[in-house]
A protein has these predicted regions:
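M16 family metallopeptidases and their MPP-like homologs
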Residues: 14-16, 21-47, 61-105, 136-161, ...
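Short, conserved secondary-structure transition motifs
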Residues: 125-126, 130, 220-233, 341-350, ...
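Non-catalytic, conformational "gating/processing" segments within enzyme and secreted inhibitor domains
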Residues: 140, 168-204, 401-402, 591, ...
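Short Ser/Thr-interspersed hydrophobic loop/turn segments at strand-loop and sheet-helix junctions
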Residues: 270-271, 721-725
Length: 863
């Protein structure tokens, strides 16, 4: 149960205990965002987010992140229009240290002038990075078009000229005005008591901060939309990104809950009206959604669509027509009940992680009027009726006062005149209601606890079919997760069928022998669950999560999809077309282009050289018959590893699994052997020219297998280089301001994978960036890592594992895949012991094994 108290200096603390896992989350919500900036302060709120981690009187540059990661934690921040949030999550035994670091950063930031100059350069690289992301550019255009007076119209990150022009005096003035106790909320959730939180908060955040109450810069008010606004930009992009928005209410408006219901009905999830009509039935868009954004002040109700290689006008009109139907007729009660249950279930799923609960409490307390508003919100959701949905649709979906913005490819025929004409046509038409949907009714979600005490340990069973079943009871939340994994994925593909695994994953849940595609989507929603398939380099999986009260129905639906997917012709052709369109639009994602070019250059024979998405010729050759054969080859129960984790009864799981997966369907054809990749004997380079703001770099080497004895030292080496206290981050970002992000990663597989460093930087910085990367890698080969740095990396890895395994789905995935790959389902429980046993000599040895510059592969993608 959440509680709240205030310190004498005005700082508010909200706390909720959760002793399920030894993890704690602290978040400091500062009630200032980019919308509070004066014109001469544009970009300062976001710049503060960067600067508060750059040192205090007690902790120099880099020490804040280093201290948190040394105690197994993660620290970061985000800035929005209305608030700036600093957050840490870590092992609860180090909870005091985590809050100490967070409080010191927010209360005592030094704002060193030299550090400010360096961080301004980093933010400018972040701005350039956003220029290479069509989704970011389209979003900025929407807010600029919708808010012509209000500061919501400015990007949170600011503009390069403004960021470079800020002085230390400006930064300090903004800090002293807004970073004061009465303007801050501490949200504390996890394995800590209220007594502990109260004592630490008073010691670390109490007392007089010496910052008097000062007037805030008033926000300009946005006038009501009086007419249609259209702003379209044509540029070198492959896809069309469109938004259509209507003026909406703020978070405290009584219509806000009903608009959330409307948004989910219209455009959230596979069973939403836009998805079914515009994406599935008519195949007009790559993606489409509707959303209600309710910030502190009037927000937006909007629909967003991404169109590739189809008529933008037709897709735009189809989207508007679906919106219009919501104003013309009331939604069916069963459909409404399902959506309301989905919204209510979000509160249950959020309880799986301490950081999720901390974010919810911080948001309610800082922005939404207090933590009590959560109960009021869900009460309002429960009271929404079909008539109420139609009422808010008629009030806010106003085609004569819409804002339309878009980012379009060169040669697009969609113009401002076209957009205005479509709006007029839809507004003047009398839309026919969409056909009634056959939706299974949902019962209201009751916010109850889990069903009882869990059994200790893991149950492992071999079913008669040969399937391996893993069951772990975890009763802290009334949810359960299922993960069914088989060997396959990219490693099983050839150039001729490259992309088959992804297409199978995209169509796996789109209908069964018993249920049509739309029926499967509705059934999942009626159970307030999720069901999806995914494909990786060495395996494929089907995964699901449901409320535990729906165990029998959820498990049966999961088994039905696994055993009898239909792969209908229409669904396969639709997803195949979409996959081909995405291949045609790859150049809009330069980081992906760089990584795929790296794989093709590093691997010359192994399937790892292939794209996870396939190539045009191979994807065009795929048919429903090919998918059915691929499914039959891989997804027989005899090949299956099935993990079930959560609020379940082991006996019931065993019985259900035996019914569903206890019999093998046929004699299974073995996967073909994969020839080993020939050794690399010389440096390899590749370059692709793209007209982008930054150059995307990948520098890498052959890597390891899942089962290699030096895998754990390789993880430690990767961590020493990555993270906010990692060597690459500290040297290339913090000291030299070469990039917004730089990271190292190790991708292992059934066969040897790769180790790589990735970075995006301005083209003129590329030679220095590559030299800097090699310099940091060489140090690991030449000098054993100091013991204190090694311990920090070890604690970070162990803490990150604890944080990452809070969700049932994460534990189910880890158990299933570790078992599938022959490492055992409880390998993750030995993780801390294995990591903590690593020595400096182990790290140096693996660095010398992997980091051979005579065999490096370097890829550049950019101007």
């Amino acid at each position: 149960m959440a509680s709240r108290f205030r310190l004498p200096n005005g700082l508010t603390v909200v706390h909720e205990p959760n002793h399920t896992a030894p993890v704690v989350a602290f978040q400091l919500w500062v009630k200032v965002g980019s919308a509070d900036e004066a014109p001469h302060e544009v970009g300062l709120a976001h710049l503060h987010e960067h600067m508060l981690f750059k040192g205090t009187a007690r902790r120099g540059p880099g020490a804040i992140a280093r201290s948190v990661e040394a105690h197994g934690g993660e620290i970061n921040a985000w800035t929005s229009f209305d608030q700036t949030v600093y957050h840490v999550v870590m092992a609860s035994r180090f909870a005091h240290e985590g809050l100490d670091v967070l409080a010191d950063a927010v209360r005592n930031s030094a704002f060193d002038a030299d550090e400010l100059t360096r961080e301004q350069e980093v933010v400018c690289e972040e701005i350039k990075r956003s220029l290479d992301m069509p989704s970011r550019r389209a979003s900025k255009a929407l807010f600029a078009g919708a808010y012509q007076q209000h500061p919501y119209g400015r990007p949170v990150i600011g503009f390069e000229a403004d960021v470079r022009g800020h002085t230390r005096e400006k930064v300090l003035s903004f800090y002293r005005t807004h970073y004061r106790p009465s303007n801050i909320v501490l949200s504390a959730v996890g394995d800590v008591t209220e007594v502990q939180v109260r004592g630490w908060a008073e010691a670390l955040l109490g007392g007089d901060w010496g910052r008097p109450e000062l007037p805030r810069h008033p926000r300009a008010l946005e006038a009501p939309f009086a007419s249609v606004r259209v702003a379209l930009t044509v540029d070198e992009v492959k896809e069309s990104w469109l938004h259509v928005a209507f003026q909406g209410p703020g978070v405290d408006h009584p219509d806000a809950p009903a608009l959330d219901v409307l948004a989910m009905l219209v455009g959230q999830g596979d069973a939403s009206r836009l998805s079914l009509e515009v994406k599935r039935k008519r195949a007009l868009v790559k993606d489409v959604s509707a959303w209600s954004w309710t910030p502190k002040e009037p927000g937006l109700f909007a629909a967003s669509l991404v169109v590739n290689q189809t008529s933008v006008e037709e897709a735009f009109e189809a989207t508007l027509s679906v919106l219009a139907t919501m104003t013309a007729a009331e939604v069916e009660p069963d459909e409404l009940d399902t959506v309301k249950s989905l919204i209510e279930s979000e509160a249950v799923y959020q309880r799986e992680t301490v950081q999720g609960v901390a974010r919810k409490l911080g948001s309610y307390e800082s922005t939404m009027g207090g933590i009590e508003r959560e109960a009021q919100y869900y009460e309002a959701i429960a009271q929404v009726t079909p008539a109420r949905v139609r009422e808010v649709a008629q009030r806010f979906i106003t085609f004569d006062r819409a804002v339309v913005t878009g980012l379009l490819p060169a040669g697009s025929t969609f113009t401002e005149e076209t957009a205005r004409a479509v709006l007029k046509r839809v507004a003047s038409a009398r839309p026919a209601p969409l056909p009634a949907r056959n939706v299974a009714p949902s019962k209201p979600i009751r916010m109850v606890g889990a069903s009882g005490k869990a059994k200790e340990g893991l149950t492992v069973e071999k079913l008669p079919s040969g399937a391996t079943l893993l069951v772990r009871e975890e009763r802290h939340v009334p949810l359960f997760a299922i993960r069914a994994s088989v060997l396959g994925g990219l490693r099983a593909e050839t150039p001729a069928n490259n992309g088959v695994s992804l297409l199978l994953a995209r169509t796996f849940t789109r209908g069964t022998a018993k249920h049509e595609p739309e029926q499967v989507s509705h059934l999942v929603d009626s159970l307030a669950g999720s069901l999806s398939a995914l494909s990786g380099r060495g395996s494929m999986s089907l995964r699901a999560e449901f409320l535990s009260k729906h165990f029998e129905r959820g498990f049966d639906l999961f088994a039905e999809v696994f055993n009898t997917p239909a792969f209908p012709e229409a669904e396969v052709r639709r997803e195949q077309t979409q996959q081909l369109r995405e291949l045609a639009a790859r150049d809009d994602r330069p980081s992906l282009v760089a990584f795929e070019l790296f794989a093709k250059t590093l691997f010359t024979q192994h399937p790892y050289r292939l794209s996870l998405s396939g190539e045009v010729a191979s994807v065009e050759a795929l048919t429903p018959e090919v998918l059915r054969a691929w499914h039959a080859r891989l997804f027989d129960p005899s090949q299956l590893t099935l993990a079930v984790v959560g609020d379940v009864d082991t006996k019931a799981v065993l019985e259900a699994a035996d019914r569903a997966f206890g019999t093998s369907r046929r004699k299974v054809e073995a996967l073909h052997d994969v020839a080993p990749e020939p050794p690399i004997t010389a440096r390899r380079e590749a370059r692709r020219v793209l007209a982008k703001a930054q150059t995307h770099l990948v520098l890498g080497f052959p890597g390891g297998r899942f089962t290699d004895p030096w895998l754990r030292p390789l993880e430690v080496m990767t961590t020493l280089l990555s993270g906010q206290s990692g060597r690459l981050f500290m040297e290339l970002r913090d000291k030299r301001s070469m990039a917004y992000s730089v990271s190292a990663s190790s991708v292992e597989g059934v066969d040897p994978g790769f180790f790589a460093v990735t970075m995006a930087t301005s083209p003129e910085k590329v030679p220095a960036a590559l030299a800097g990367i090699r310099e940091e890698l060489q140090k690991l080969k030449d000098v054993p890592v100091p013991m204190d740095e090694l311990v920090r990396a070890q604690r970070y890895l162990v803490g990150s594992q604890q944080i990452g395994l809070q969700r049932n789905g994460a534990r189910a995935a880890t158990m299933a895949l570790d078992s599938l790959y022959g490492m055992g389902p409880e390998r993750y429980r030995r993780y801390a012991e294995e990591i903590e046993a690593i020595t400096p000599d182990d790290v140096q040895a693996v660095a010398r094994r992997i980091l051979d510059f005579d065999r490096e592969t370097v890829v550049q993608v950019g101007p």
